[in-house]
């Protein structure tokens, strides 16, 4: 019996790390009656039920999804074959307790693995530092100690510093502390990337080099925020964004926040209530002046704000983005007297203080929120190499959450930047659809596994992978964001009708000029498609029940059986009922929970349109939500521009919260520990990238297979930065190249003194007398060419067979072909063959006299004309040659996208004349 229970338990010890392994549990939906019964069972006190006490769990203070070497897809060679092997990076979760912390890893197999667990007092912030970028001129002083863990504890290593005033760096390889950074004021958060370690203080920011941990720069002009983030910042791969306390006009970028213009019934009612409140406040001020007492309606915070405004005129809602590589050392000061070195952008984002912000993976999109939490702004940052004043900041979206106030604590992007999830302290995660380039989200943009091309229906690819069949079978056309276009491969988007927004999009994407010039992008207001609510009470999730669904996109967890005190919250949270939430997008891992006996399909993750959303709350339960966008069900007709709706449902859950009975898992770790293996792999890749000798290698690493390719004075800094120098903003090319249309023709120029067979099946020759002198190719004046003197096939059939019709040969002789690219029509009274050169006087007449009145001769001459006609070169642009009996009709239509030539003609089967000494020349239609 005990063995059976041990087998069914979702927890078991890990073989490689020694920690705990938690298997995912399937989430089952309950009916309304089952939910009511479960609620009544939870409300009944434990003493009346007589059931044993549940397992006690430790209190969680904060949760976070971490990015480290373990899930670094760019530098870990294990993930470079991600598309072929199906290998996906694991999810890395950090949980902070009132006594210690814990680190979990969830690989693609779905089994959560405990990697680290300690109990050393309260921990306010912790980060697993990624391996830094280094080269020949920049070495990593802690390479042998990595991976490193940065921790901000209540009691530092020295024991004499104030609480939360030092950052201790521990080696997970050896277990020793390698560095301690002391501060005089409390630390509120830690951020890190491959270049720097950022320590966030109140109204200050300090950055340290990731290789030496020496101070690189610091910022002292941050605007204070009441919480939950006392000093909100956003750290990308290279840029750092923070809230500035003033707006400096000389550094202000073009653009910034636009008016939201959101008017609703709720907003009107709340505005009226605020107006009434302001009126009552004015009455209270009059009472204050008469009685000399402070009315109860005015809080101390309001007085402090007014006093601060009198001392120093601070401006809320200002964002400054700096480049951590070029900002220089020392203090970063944005003032009228300072230069703009290292300042990327400086712009107003909100009217209220900024509460939270986050970059997307590319660093070009920035989402900001204010303290009210009504609206979230999405900005596109287009930099300029000269100064921040030349930078353009486009306000693409306003994500409208609601009219009630809420504090934002977490923001995350999907990997393709088409979805944004904003989580508040109320435990609600709001899912918004966006486009990386702006525009209204719709079926065309969010119902495909790919980010659709904005300007064309075609999937622009380098040919590295096959185009998925869903793009052509399930979607209209080829997922073009431009409505009303033909799905034909040759259809030009210029023939479609564009609305005002699409016209602007065409202008901005095709305009290689200044993005600061008008018209600026029009602001889009987007509502959330899903609101996923977290439970307000902690519950025990069993294998049978699991979380319970109370509605689409809203679930609740079973309440505990025994009475417990309210959960402990973060030190920065002062209001009751607030708890921490973190979210991230990732590949589905619920297949194991739903089909434990089946194997994972190889390409199962590539078939979904949206990745799964993972949400973890302060109760230690990680839940995977499946997201299924679909066209709006109330839409009368489904088209490319149909709005979206979304269905969300929980699929699997992991109970990661630890109990007091769990053992600690502390370094030093074994060599096969996942964190150590990932650190070794990333450092090895860094050595190869810098051209250095990795530790343990038998010999030097050379580039291009030759040691001579590395010069003695080779600069490793240039090789180190080659990835960051890749252009990340490009401009789309024209929809139709010049040579794709009928406005150009390919013609053959024959020099004098040669005889050329025009067609292998034709007897038409081009020859000269022996007295002629050969001339080099294209060495002549076009004005000297007398095309009217050419006698090239002077007899041809009429376009329409008319009885008794006869025209002189001289009427049609030597007239050049005219093709109008705009209208797509041909001049039917012209010949189809043009040859530049001179012919013997009697050659054409002798050839004509033998076949002039025979049908066979007519067919042969037409075949020769087709073999050398310019119309063969523009077949794809709309020219179509059809044969009906003995009548050949040359027709063209601007709407046609494919051409056809009768294959029973000899000229169609005969190849073009090939002569290596006679290249093809490109001439416009107007060539004489």
UniProtKB/Swiss-Prot annotation:
Positions bearing the Glycyl lysine isopeptide (Lys-Gly) (interchain with G-Cter in SUMO2) cross-link: 215
Locations listed in the record: Nucleus; Cytoplasm; Cytoplasm, Cytoskeleton; Preautophagosomal structure
One GO molecular-function entry: histone binding
UniProt WD repeat ranges: 69-114
Positions bearing the site annotation: Breakpoint for translocation to form BCAS4-BCAS3: 824-825
Cross-link entry Glycyl lysine isopeptide (Lys-Gly) (interchain with G-Cter in SUMO1), positions: 215
SUPFAM superfamilies membership: WD40 repeat-like (SSF50978)
Chief localisation class: nucleus
Effect of residue 430 to A: Almost abolishes recruitment to preautophagosomal structure in response to mitophagy. No effect on interaction with PHAF1
Keyword set includes Phosphoprotein: yes
Effect of residue 401 to A: Almost abolishes recruitment to preautophagosomal structure in response to mitophagy. No effect on interaction with PHAF1
Swiss-Prot/TrEMBL induction comment: By estrogen.
Alphabetical GO biological process terms: angiogenesis; autophagy; cell-cell signaling; cellular response to estrogen stimulus; positive regulation of catalytic activity; positive regulation of endothelial cell migration; positive regulation of transcription by RNA polymerase II; regulation of actin cytoskeleton organization
Effect of residue 377 to A: No effect on recruitment to preautophagosomal structure in response to mitophagy. No effect on interaction with PHAF1
Record field: compositional bias (Low complexity): 480-494, 505-514, 755-771, 887-901
Expression by tissue: Expressed in stomach, liver, lung, kidney, prostate, testis, thyroid gland, adrenal gland, brain, heart, skeletal muscle, colon, spleen, small intestine, placenta, blood leukocyte and mammary epithelial cells. Expressed in undifferentiated ES cells. Expressed in blood islands and nascent blood vessels derived from differentiated ES cells into embryoid bodies (BD). Expressed in endothelial cells. Not detected in brain. Expressed in brain tumors (at protein level). Expressed in brain. Highly expressed in breast cancers and in glioma cell lines.
Subunit structure: Interacts with histone H3, ESR1, KAT2B and PELP1; the interactions occur in a estrogen-dependent manner. Interacts with beta-tubulin and VIM. Interacts (via C-terminal) with PHAF1; the interaction is requrired for the association with the phagophore.
PANTHER family (alphabetical): BCAS3 MICROTUBULE ASSOCIATED CELL MIGRATION FACTOR, BREAST CARCINOMA AMPLIFIED SEQUENCE 3
Protein name: BCAS3 microtubule associated cell migration factor
Source species: Homo sapiens
